[in-house]
Amino acid sequence: SYYHRAYEYDQGHLEGMLGLGRQLLRHEDLEASFKIYQNIQLQHLDRLYGEQAREVFFNAGVIKQRLGDRMRALDYFEKALDYDPEHKESINALLENYEATKEWDRYIDLTRQLLAVEQDPKIRFAKLSQIGDIYAEQIQDPGMAVQSYLEALSLEEQSVIILRKLLNLYTNTRQWVEAVDMLNRLIDLEPDDGKKSRFAYTIGVIYRDEVHDWQASVDAFDKALDADCHQLKAFEAIDRILTERKQWKELERAYRRMLKRVAEFKEEEKMGSLYMMLWQNLGEIYRSRLGHMQSAIQAYEMAASLSP
């Protein structure tokens, strides 16, 4: 070939050596190609400018990688980056190696290096999400995982996947205010009423058991019932909280709201029985808790009219 002839004519000619090294590498003559790149380093290193030096070290790294010498390959890829810090092929080659060797800190540093020059928001989102996964699952640093996921979320604010990952991290680290924020955002994005209700119920449990804010808890359980009145454990929770705190007027209002919700479904066997029981219990609240006898009578009469 032309490069072979040029090399035979002048074994120190830089352009000829570079061309021959490339050609041999393309033809998988790895040992011969590596020898050329070694000779370039010995003869011309002080004359190589950035792009040429990067090519020499990157290709030497590719050869060593294919020959199974991972450590030497890493050294060459790192040297290639010294001459061209934004060279994506060198960075990706290093990322592949650091992932295989589980050198996660270096992997993240290099990914951040790619992000510094990456403009595509979808690629940025994917890489930030990946960094978050590494911090969460490999390094087990929830704080840094949260930081990375929040960066990703700033690019795709409606990413349910990232919101759920943040919810899990906030829950595991007992950051309840932040967990509630994630749940509220999930509610806003969720089209299914049953799932909305379950998210709201979870908020109620957090306020009740972790934050110890009974009013916020009742409000959240109410939202769960507004989304799906079949979520009966939410109403049971409201009943229990308000009864324990002797909030009788609030309890009466809660029963009134529940009656209004259930009325729409009272033809269902289960909900019909519940509808009757709600009127009966409301009558008892009026009678024994609020002392409103006339209202109690009316509620009892309504319950009696529904009795089969």
Predicted features along the sequence, with ranges:
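Repeat-based scaffolding regions
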Residues: 1-308
